[in-house]
A protein has these predicted regions:
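Fe(II)/2-oxoglutarate oxygenase catalytic core
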Residues: 1-113
Length: 113
């Protein structure tokens, strides 16, 4: 199955509330090869938030609210700092990579700027 690249504005109704929630959670750098710090899987903190985010994300692609679908979804908050103080520096453009054994991935920016 192939999914198109999409950009969806205003994913959360109240992104500032979600951002404040995210900033209150503990972060660490356990395993993985990724920049910055990451929370534990969000379902460990709030299963309802995890489910609502997951179903909203999947609904952008299809009607995944049908009982015959079974999906394994991991959700995290991640803090990543700029690699350069100059926000236009090419070092801050991104980190191209491939997630192994992943069919679909997404991200939501909660940066206020």
């Amino acid at each position: 199955m192939r999914f198109p690249i999409q950009c969806y504005d205003d994913f959360y109704k109240d992104p500032e509330l979600v951002r404040n929630y995210a900033l209150q959670l503990p972060y660490g750098s356990k395993g993985g090869v990724y920049p910055g710090l990451r929370t534990a899987e969000l379902g460990e903190y709030d299963q309802n938030f995890h489910n609502a985010t997951t179903f909203k994300f999947l609904s952008l692609c299809d009607d995944f609210d049908q009982p015959e679908y079974e999906v394994l979804v991991e959700t995290y908050f991640q803090k990543i700092w700029r690699f350069s103080k100059d926000k236009d520096d090419p070092l801050n453009v991104g980190w191209v990579h491939a997630d192994t054994n992943t069919v679909l991935a997404g991200l939501v920016y909660l940066t206020p700027e």
